[in-house]
Amino acid sequence: DWTFDRFEELITAVHVDLDGNGKFDKNDLYGYHDRKGFLYPLMYTAAGLKTVIEDEAGRPVFNMPGNEAFQTIYDWCDRVFYKEEAYYKQDAGNDFFVKHPMFQEGKALFSDMTFFYVGMMRDMLSDFGIIVFPKYTAEQDRYYSWVEGGAGCIGVAVTCQEKEAVGAALEALSCASMRDVIPIYYENNLKAKYSR
C-alpha cells in the first residue's frame, strides 16, 4: 500500500553523505526535496485533514488548535524529514528547482512540485513519474493532494450593482474551465509537452 509508512521507508533508506564530509548538504543524496514551508501542509492534506471545517451552524471554524491528528502528522514530519535527515533543508520558495536542482540532478528520490514545474524536468537524465501523496494509513478512504491554484480570490468592485450576475458569471466560467480547459491541459501539456 502507498502509505506514510511506505513513503518513510523509501525516503529514509536513500539519504547518503555522498561527499563524505560528515554533514548533509547540497552535495548529498536525499529521499525528499521540497519548497521551504510546504512539508507540513502537504502531509496533513495527504492524511485527509482539513484546517477549516463547518460547525453545527454551517459556519467555518479553525480546526487545528487542540486537534491531536494534526499533532500526530507534525510529529511524523519532524521525525522523518528532520531528525532522520530524509529532506534537504533549503531556504527557497517556489524557485527551489532553480536554486537547488536536487531532483533534476538525481540527488532526491521524491520531490513535490506543481505541474508548472514538470516541464523543467524534461531534460533530466533520469526517468521520473508523477504520483499522488501517500495515504496516512491503508484504511484511509482515498488519496488526497493539496491543489495550489495560483489565485485565492477574484476581486469584485464595491460599486458593482449586479453582484448576483457577477457571481453567476464567475461560477459559469469556473465550471466551463473545469469541463473544457482542464482536460485539454492534461492531454496537451501533461501527456505531451511536459512528460517524455
What are these regions (language model features)?
Residues 1, 33-58, 148-157:
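Periplasmic solute-binding protein
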Residues 2-5, 64-71, 97, 159-164:
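Soluble non-cytosolic domains of exported or imported proteins
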Residues 8-13, 42-92:
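Glycine-centered hinge/linker elements that transmit conformational signals in sensory
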Residues 8-15, 74-78, 100, 166-174:
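Non-transmembrane alpha-helical segments in soluble domains
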Residues 8-10, 95-111:
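Short helices/loops that flank or line small-molecule/ion binding pockets
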Residues 18-28:
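Acidic, glycine-anchored loop motifs typical of Ca2+
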Residues 36, 113-118:
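Beta->alpha turn/N-cap motifs
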Residues 122-192:
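Extracytoplasmic/periplasmic substrate-recognition and gating elements
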